[in-house]
Each structure stands twice: as C-alpha cells, then as structure tokens.
Amino acid sequence: SYESWGYKHYNGVHWYPRISVYDSKFGWTKDQHLGREFYGNFGTFDVKLTFASNFIVEATGNLVNRSEVLPDELREKLDLKNFANKKWNSEPSVIIPYNKNNRKTWYFHAENVHDFAFTADPTYRIGEARWKDKVCYSLVQEPHASRWLNAADFGAECLKVFSEDFGEYVYHKVIVADAQDGMEYPMITLDRGSDPGYRDLLAHEIGHMWFFGQIGNNETYRALLDEGFTQFLTAWALIKIDGEFMIENKKTNWYKSKFYKPFKAIDSEIYYSYIKDATKQKDPVL
C-alpha cells in the first residue's frame, strides 16, 4: 500500500496462503517464492473484499454485484473521459465522500485461474475499450487522467494482436491499473508511468497473460517462457500497433530535437538488453 494526495492505495498480491503445486515432472514443487517467479494451482476463486465506500476496486474475475457497488450512475461519474482536461498531478476531486461508518463489499468470481489479485483506490477513474467479447478496463488515479486516456484502447489493441497471432485470450477481461508497479496477475496488471512511455510496459504486462496467465507454466524451471517470451511479445505488439519505431515524448531540448533519432522497437525491447547486461556485467539466467 501507499498514500497519494491523502488517500490510501492498496495492491493485494501474494496475500493468502497457497498450496504447493504437484506436477508430473517434479511432484511437489519446493521452490520458495522470494518476491520473483511464482507457480500456482488452477482453481475457482470466490472473493469478497470489504472497503470504505469511497474506494473503487478491481480484481481477478467477474464482478458479481456490479449493480450494487458500481451502479450505472456512479460508473458514468467515474468515467475517465470526464477528467481528460485535468491538470497532471493536481488534487483529485471527491466523487464519493468518505464516511467511516459506510462500507462496500465487492464480490468477485473467477474460474480456471491460478492466482487472485486486486487493487483499490478512492481516486481511481475508469476507462474501457473492447475487442470482440473481451474488455480492457483502465483504472487511473484521477490526477494522472490526462496522460492515461488511451490506456484501455491500447490494452484492447494488445489483446487483439496477441489473440490473433498467438492464440485467443480465454478470459473476458484484462485490467491495466495505474498502481506504481510493473507486475502481472491473472486478468490484472499493475502498472505505472504515462503515455507514451508506458506503452512498452502495458504491452509487456498484458503479454504475460499468455504463458504465465493462461498456461501457468513453472516460471522458475522455464524462465525463458516467462520474461523471455514476454519480451518478444512486447516488441511484437509495439511494432504491430505503433510501427517500427518507438513513440516517444517530443524532445524539448534544442540539441536533442535536432539530432535525436528514435529507437526501433526491436532494438529497444530486444537487442539493447544484451548491451545493457554486458555493460552492467549482468548475465541473467534463461
């Protein structure tokens, strides 16, 4: 958790006891979760999360009691487009006043997933974009709204590209959340930054939904199928959606604006990694 503009923010990850996976290769897996790779059993989750009534919550799975906790009238007030002209990092407005005696319970149901995560924040505002019967929701802290307007659209584009080229996404939604992080969990990604710099992060975390999310492979045993494959997917999506070159902020420095050359996505996301590892004397295990 952390605090911004006087409001508490919560990311609920690795928050409950998990049973070791028993698989055909290793039997009971004994790798300890040390804040990095993880491996879980597929199952059904029914989770009820109770927060103060001013919190907006999203999580793995289907929101069962949407009409109760997020009725249409409130959803319209929270729509990200309403805050398109909000000054960056300015004080958020109050949509739902805090009352210490009022609580809401958000009920999520998820089937055939191997983990459950959630995010909650009173300043979240909601964007939405669809591809076929899939939906990408963006949860954006209101002070960041002006530079997150295309997050849901970009996320839906990633779903389209990955589904058409690598096998269709099996779940009904994916979340991209403005959560000062860079991690993936079934149906939900916790992200940071702003457009256009966050594009590679969003593509990367959504890309994790393929091997990590839907197949649920042992990341410790086959690390290449986790970060390695996902880094390839990141470059693939950026090239398909934005073209050969990375979209970057306009250079305000005179020298850079005159001589700077944009990076190719394949270089930035794939090839330069080897250079960085060599110069930092790092050689990650694949």
Task: Tell where the protein language model's regions lie, with residue ranges.
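Reverse-transcriptase-like RNA-dependent polymerase core
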Residues: A117-K134
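Composition- and surface-driven signal marking solvent-exposed, interaction-prone regions
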Residues: E3-W5, G61-V64, P122, Y221-E227
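Extended, low-hydrophobicity, Ser/Thr/Pro/Gly-biased non-transmembrane segments
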Residues: S1-A117
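Hydrophobic beta-strand segments of well-ordered beta-sheets in folded domains
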Residues: V47, C136-Y137
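Hydrophobic alpha-helical and helix-loop surface patches within well-folded domains
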Residues: F108, S138-L286
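Helix N-cap / beta->alpha transition motif
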Residues: A52, P71, D121, L139-E142
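Extracellular/periplasmic catalytic domains that process cell-envelope and extracellular macromolecules
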Residues: F38-N41, N99-N102, R130-W131, E168-V170, ...
